[in-house]
């Protein structure tokens, strides 16, 4: 029973992530996909991109 709940919860979170990213892409359809996140479409994405870039820099 615990495994079933865990699997369903994980699938739910994965779907939220997928549709969340799709919604961001739909919010700014003319944006260049290689340009990075658009601050107007998702201001929080800029913060996460900066954190990810810093982690990549530290790791190498």
Swiss-Prot record:
Chief location bin: secreted
UniProt KW keywords: Amidation, Antibiotic, Antimicrobial, Chemotaxis, G-protein coupled receptor impairing toxin, Immunity, Innate immunity, Mast cell degranulation, Membrane, Repeat, Secreted, Signal, Target cell membrane, Target membrane, Toxin
Cell location: Secreted; Target cell membrane
Signal peptide positions on this chain: 1-27
AXPX repeat spans: 27-30, 31-34, 35-38, 41-43
Propeptide residues per the UniProt entry: 28-45
Residues that bear Isoleucine amide: 59
Keyword Signal assigned: yes
GO biological process per UniProt: chemotaxis; defense response to bacterium; innate immune response
Entry comment describing in which tissues the protein is expressed: Expressed by the venom gland.
GO cellular component labels: extracellular region; membrane; other organism cell membrane
Gene Ontology molecular-function annotations: toxin activity
Domain of life: Eukaryota
Function: Antimicrobial and mast cell degranulating peptide. Has broad spectrum antibacterial activity against both Gram-positive and Gram-negative bacteria (S.aureus MIC=32-64 ug/ml, S.xylosus MIC=2 ug/ml, S.alactolyticus MIC=12 ug/ml, C.koseri MIC=4 ug/ml, E.coli MIC=8 ug/ml, K.pneumoniae MIC=32 ug/ml, P.aerugiosa MIC=192 ug/ml, S.choleraesuis MIC=32 ug/ml, S.typhimurium MIC=32 ug/ml, V.parahamelytics MIC=16 ug/ml). Affects membrane permeability of E.coli. Shows hemolytic activities on sheep, chicken and human erythrocytes.
Family, per entry: Belongs to the MCD family. Mastoparan subfamily.
Protein name per its UniProtKB record: Mastoparan-A
Organism: Vespa analis
């Amino acid at each position: 029973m615990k495994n079933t709940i865990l699997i369903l919860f994980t699938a739910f979170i994965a779907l939220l992530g997928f549709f969340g990213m799709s919604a961001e892409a739909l919010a700014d359809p003319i944006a260049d996909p290689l340009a990075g996140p658009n601050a107007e479409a998702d201001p929080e994405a800029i913060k996460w991109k900066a954190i990810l870039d810093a982690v990549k820099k530290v790791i190498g």
